[in-house]
Swiss-Prot record:
<dbReference type="GO" id="GO:0030234">
    <property type="term" value="F:enzyme regulator activity"/>
</dbReference>
<dbReference type="GO" id="GO:0006123">
    <property type="term" value="P:mitochondrial electron transport, cytochrome c to oxygen"/>
</dbReference>
<keyword id="KW-0812">Transmembrane</keyword>
<dbReference type="InterPro" id="IPR036418">
    <property type="entry name" value="Cyt_c_oxidase_su6a_sf"/>
</dbReference>
<comment type="subunit">
    <text>Component of the cytochrome c oxidase (complex IV, CIV), a multisubunit enzyme composed of 14 subunits. The complex is composed of a catalytic core of 3 subunits MT-CO1, MT-CO2 and MT-CO3, encoded in the mitochondrial DNA, and 11 supernumerary subunits COX4I, COX5A, COX5B, COX6A, COX6B, COX6C, COX7A, COX7B, COX7C, COX8 and NDUFA4, which are encoded in the nuclear genome.</text>
</comment>
<comment type="similarity">
    <text>Belongs to the cytochrome c oxidase subunit 6A family.</text>
</comment>
<keyword id="KW-0999">Mitochondrion inner membrane</keyword>
<feature type="topological domain" description="Mitochondrial matrix">
    <location>
        <begin position="13"/>
        <end position="24"/>
    </location>
</feature>
<feature type="transit peptide" description="Mitochondrion">
    <location>
        <begin position="1"/>
        <end position="12"/>
    </location>
</feature>
<keyword id="KW-0560">Oxidoreductase</keyword>
<feature type="topological domain" description="Mitochondrial intermembrane">
    <location>
        <begin position="50"/>
        <end position="97"/>
    </location>
</feature>
<keyword id="KW-1133">Transmembrane helix</keyword>
<protein>
    <recommendedName>
        <fullName>Cytochrome c oxidase subunit 6A2, mitochondrial</fullName>
    </recommendedName>
</protein>
<keyword id="KW-0496">Mitochondrion</keyword>
<feature type="transmembrane region" description="Helical">
    <location>
        <begin position="25"/>
        <end position="49"/>
    </location>
</feature>
<dbReference type="GO" id="GO:0005743">
    <property type="term" value="C:mitochondrial inner membrane"/>
</dbReference>
<comment type="pathway">
    <text>Energy metabolism; oxidative phosphorylation.</text>
</comment>
Length: 97
């Protein structure tokens, strides 16, 4: 006895069901405008308030940091590729801008 073959249809696909996504889209739109956008604005404002200039920490010449066994192949050989004079010290200390 042979089993009846069903036609290949998309019976479980969401496109086959009607009126499926209306409530979910409304919920996510509400969450975006009520929760996400004010949170981004609040974080931006907080970042703006705390964006003042902070003094550099005191330089401490630790023996295990900033070891140069051979020079870098660019520049003077002492600065790293993405060296920032305001943040990154050299082995001898901070640079004076």
């Amino acid at each position: 006895m042979a089993l009846p073959l069903r036609p290949l249809t998309r019976g479980l696909a969401s496109a086959a069901k009607g009126g499926h996504g209306g409530a979910g889209a409304r919920t996510w739109r509400l969450l975006t405008f009520v929760l996400a956008l004010p949170s981004v604005a609040l974080c931006t404002f907080n970042s703006y308030l705390h964006s003042g200039h902070r003094p550099r920490p005191e330089f401490r010449p630790y023996q295990h940091l900033r070891i140069r066994t051979k020079p870098y192949p660019w520049g003077d050989g002492n600065h790293t590729l993405f060296h920032n004079t305001h943040v990154n010290p050299l082995p001898t200390g901070y640079e004076h801008p």
